């Protein structure tokens, strides 16, 4: 069986996961700001060991292309390119916003862009419905108040339904603790 390695270092969180073609089998996510280049390969190996798979079992590496930390994005891309060259597997890059939406349903994906701004992407059935953009918190509140559909909200670390505007805005402003990443 072939697997996909998922890697995101575009924020203060290191995210590493392994999936088969249907679901994520194992994932880790924790704050590793300024240490991602030091710990990413160790965490990849830890997941391989936990799943009892070998690197040669990976046929695809899925990596974030941003938005996010430029240095962080370069870390993940360097790891992905190195592994792809050694293993002969392909690389797929996805928007950081797209990595956290499910393939079915309507999602608004929101990432903290700092300075009271948010990266926002809208997706339906896994496909973007509008181009990703950057909004201030006030613009985001206004935009969300005009929505008539009932999307799920995918923040950087969780898919959340029925979250209030204030809670969501507080979360992306860093006023609430981070919640666990889930696919």
Features from the language model and the residues they span:
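DPxDG-like acidic metal-binding loop motif
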Residues: 60-91
